[in-house]
Amino acid sequence: EIASCLVGSEMCIRDRNIAVEAALQHVWGYAVGLDMTRRDLQMKMREAGRPWELGKAFDQSAPIGPLHRAADVAGIHQAGIWLQVNGKDKQRSDIGKLIWSVAETIAYLSRYFRLEAGDLIYTGTPEGVGPVVRGDTMVGGVEGLGTLSVRID
């Protein structure tokens, strides 16, 4: 899954219950990221009635590109977002069409987690999520943030 990522600023330190209207003041910057899922582990844990975080939290599950300061990135909240697998489009949309805005995501998460400077938050993803296998190459990007290329080994 392609995602835009945001990085908490110093203003985030120990903040909880952040209002949507104030949420973007807590963002230091943005990056391109891939939010990977091991469906085999996820389903195995789910079938066993266990928490399935192992399907999301495995080695190299969240590659991320270079960080860009929020002040240096214009129009990120309407930017194009896309992912190709082996040169074929799999996901293509813009961030403004995602279910939750960046500000809504921060506000929601701050109800349950103490957000701190340096925290990485992977946002939502457009439709088109699908499997990848060894040897596949994923190239994704967010307009204004560049691209990220990952080969599955």
Predicted regions and their residues:
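Single conserved hydrophobic/aromatic residue that forms the stacking wall/gate
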Residues: E1-S9, I13
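Catalytic-pocket segment enriched in acidic/His residues
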Residues: R39-D153
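Short, flexible, glycine/charge-rich loop motifs used to bind or transfer phosphoryl groups or to couple energy/partner
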Residues: E1-I2, V20-E21, R111, G128
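Extended, compositionally biased flexible segments
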Residues: E10, R14-A31, D40-M43
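A structure-centric signal for secondary-structure junctions around beta-strands
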Residues: L6-G8, V27, Q78
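Alpha-helix termination/capping residues and helix-transition junctions
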Residues: C5, L24, Y112-L115
